[in-house]
Amino acid sequence: MARRPARCYRYCKNKPYPKSRYNRAVPDAKIRIYDLGRKKATVDEFPLCIHLVSNELEQLSSEALEAARICANKYITKVSGRDSFHLRVRVHPFHVLRINKMLSCAGADRLQQGMRGAWGKPHGLAARVSIGQIIMSARTKDSNKDVVIEGLRRARYKFPGQQKIIISKKWGFTPLNRDEYIAKKTNGEVIDDGAYVKFLSRKGNLEANLQQFPNYQYSA
């Protein structure tokens, strides 16, 4: 039987139905890669962060997430190179979609009249997103802003409903604003930790803090 159109599962009507010991034989999600581009780039290399934000309460199928990921990655890679950005899909398809299969193909001499609204068997996976939730994020250099915005704009057409593209005030994927990050970096209160930063703790062993944050300006 062919895959049912995703418009049948667009809205969040029921409770979340994740995979569990009671819900078995669930097919794998189509999307398997959630981080793309130059993942090992330090925080200082990619200061600009751009988000694709959902404007509706809906369900996004794993096929749509995979299509959007491929679309954004292909465009940005072709225009500016694969090492010019770091793209991350921020939602995961944990909700199991169900289908009650009934014969309606050419081989059936009549349409099968089954129970309406029956429970059904696992059919696919979808991510449940709310209004204002981030679907995809990309960090890059300031000079590459227009290319990343265009890549996310093209990926937006793979999803139902409305989405908006937002340029974040934060420094990369960190929770710090740009001026706040520069001030803390100058003062030695943060150090690079992959795509994020590690903060100086005000508690704990003083020697360990001194070793980890040697540039911090301790006041007497």
Curated annotation (Swiss-Prot):
Keywords: Cytoplasm, Ribonucleoprotein, Ribosomal protein
Pfam families: Ribosomal_L16
PROSITE patterns in the cross-refs: RIBOSOMAL_L10E
BP-aspect Gene Ontology terms: translation
Gene3D superfamilies in the record: 3.30.60.300, Ribosomal protein L10e/L16
Disulfide partners: none
Subcellular location: Cytoplasm
Gene Ontology CC terms: cell surface; cytosolic large ribosomal subunit
Gene Ontology terms, MF aspect: structural constituent of ribosome
Protein family: Belongs to the universal ribosomal protein uL16 family.
Subunit structure: Component of the large ribosomal subunit. Mature ribosomes consist of a small (40S) and a large (60S) subunit. The 40S subunit contains about 32 different proteins and 1 molecule of RNA (18S). The 60S subunit contains 45 different proteins and 3 molecules of RNA (25S, 5.8S and 5S).
Function according to Swiss-Prot or TrEMBL: Component of the ribosome, a large ribonucleoprotein complex responsible for the synthesis of proteins in the cell. The small ribosomal subunit (SSU) binds messenger RNAs (mRNAs) and translates the encoded message by selecting cognate aminoacyl-transfer RNA (tRNA) molecules. The large subunit (LSU) contains the ribosomal catalytic site termed the peptidyl transferase center (PTC), which catalyzes the formation of peptide bonds, thereby polymerizing the amino acids delivered by tRNAs into a polypeptide chain.
Name of this chain's protein: Large ribosomal subunit protein uL16
Gene: RPL10
